[in-house]
Amino acid sequence: MYFVVVATHKEEMRQERARLQDAFAAYIHDLTHHPDVTVHHGGQTLSERDKTVTGFVLVLEAPSIEVAQEFVDGSPYARAGTFAESHVCPWNWLTGRPG
């Protein structure tokens, strides 16, 4: 199943988010942490005003929403409490789908 993750960081956690950026990138690319989850696409969301990072969007493939949520909850950002909010939603991928 495919899922979309939309997460927004707390504004007051900007420095902590920046400090953890490399750890988060390593986490989503290292399959040993999450062998059942594949990250197909991802990127940062930006403020319209000054283009600072406000959060991120990921497209995941996982066997269930519970596994996808565990992946998000195990991330360096989640463990550090940087999220103002995060949502994992099932996604019906229609265009640009691999395979």
Sequence positions of predicted segments:
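Conserved, structured core segments of small domains
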Residues: 1-99
